[in-house]
Amino acid sequence: MSLIHLFLLLGLLSLEAAASFSPGSRSILRDIGSNVADQKDNAIELNATNFDSVFQDSPAKYAVLEFFAHWCPACRNYKPHYEKVARLFNGADAVYPGVVLMTRVDCAIKMNVKLCDKFSINHYPMLFWAPPKRFVGGSWGPKQEKNEISVVNEWRTADLLLNWINKQIGSSYGLDDQKLGNLLSNISDQEQISQAIFDIEEATEEAFDIILAHKAIKSSETSASFIRFLQLLVAHHPSRRCRTGSAEILVNFDDICPSGECSYDQESGAKDSLRNFHICGKDVPRGYYRFCRGSKNETRGFSCGLWVLMHSLSVRIEDGESQFAFTAICDFINNFFMCDDCRRHFHDMCLSVKTPFKKARDIALWLWSTHNKVNERLKKDEDSLGTGDPKFPKMIWPPKQLCPSCYLSSTEKNIDWDHDQVYKFLKKYYGQKLVSVYKKNGESVSKEEVIAAAEEMAVPTNALVVPVGAALAIALASCAFGALACYWRTQQKNRKYNYNPHYLKRYNSNYMVMNTFSNTESEREKER
């Protein structure tokens, strides 16, 4: 019995201790916890007293209003996401002040109960969108008609919320955007290229989406062009998930596009449809650009990302692949780039090349020179029409501060380039820098993106491009395409791609990319 009495005594003592733990004590612990995080809130906390006045006096064009409860674990977990977006628009360091007012109301506080009832809050968190003055004296109900206050449906992550806002106001804001005053100074910063891997994935997916939207693969010629570009991506795209997605499309291509006529069926049950493939994974596109984001919604973006993709491909090929890469890039732009004037101008520059490329250096320098010629032409047009990006004017690249050794001499009208130094710079900037600087400064992006990018940005292993006959002989002898075997759905599919000369002839392929993917991770580290 004495043991039972001891347990009862301990229970009473614990109850007394719990009772003595006052709300003030809990508040102290809360303060200690918050001091650990010590993060400044950018979202404006509203209550029943200041609600109308804050919205009435706001100069912002739009507002987001979050209703939450401080006791709600989901609300606490969501707060960092909401704050990521709020820092763009609110506070002294706002990147885009005066565009969107980010606010929140705690429904767990008694004075706010009636306010929350006016908006029919039945779960937490719940987000609303409207011009600020519409919230003044406003209310919302699920059965109300013609209410300018609308519910935000896509909000669960910072990315989703910002993408939703972008759609509402036709913007292209990104979570990592800086103040515009800092952007121009950073354009020549080598470390900025570390963000371009995300833009390369974005541009790859957007190019694929454009092909789907325009149903652009409609003949054996366009089919062959698409296949060649896929082969180039499988071998040398700097993102692993884009290499994987490209390979999956490539090996299923004869089912998707028999006789060069592709299926674009949108029905979920249509297995043999291009729309069922994600060339860079299901998480892409994200809906915004980073390195390539312009100061205006209509500038830079996709075209910039496509250029970065082509440059990154050009510095990853080997000598024997240079002509194949040149043909693949030129044909892809000619068949699938929908800006007609740009397409024709680029095609003319491709046609001006009379001698086949033999060295990887040659294709990298040709693409660099071509890009500068395009910039010169566009700069004249944009300066005369006022259509350029004031924060990112077209320039001869690289600027001297980015690569002083690239310049032998320069005047206002002419530059004498050191092409050896330019090539070294291109290799480093679009190759090594695309990986190493990002890994060094990975804290600047979200944890999820760091984890993904650490895997995605490994430089692909060496690839070999050989004539069709030799490729078939090697395939028969050594079962090449070993690494792609994991993507082959059946052994029959493998034989169709590796052993069937009629299949290859059907697309008039002069060369075949043979990417083994068989190097170890330690070998990839050496390549970096």
Curated annotation (Swiss-Prot):
It comes from Arabidopsis thaliana. Plants lacking QSOX1 display more sensitivity to the toxic cations lithium and sodium than wild-type plants. Induction: By salt and norspermidine treatments and phosphate starvation. Disulfide bonds join C72-C75, C292-C304, C339-C342, C403-C406. The gene is QSOX1. This is Sulfhydryl oxidase 1. Residues 35-170 form the Thioredoxin domain. It is found in: Secreted, Cell wall. Residues 295-397 form the ERV/ALR sulfhydryl oxidase domain. GO terms for cellular component: extracellular region; Golgi cis cisterna. Keywords: Cell wall, Disulfide bond, FAD, Flavoprotein, Glycoprotein, Oxidoreductase, Redox-active center, Secreted, Signal. Residues 1-19 form the signal peptide. Its cofactor is FAD. Glycans are attached at N47, N186, N297. GO terms for biological process: positive regulation of potassium ion transport; response to cation stress. The active site is at C72 (nucleophile), C75 (nucleophile). It comes from the Eukaryota. Its EC number is 1.8.3.2. It catalyses: 2 R'C(R)SH + O2 = R'C(R)S-S(R)CR' + H2O2.
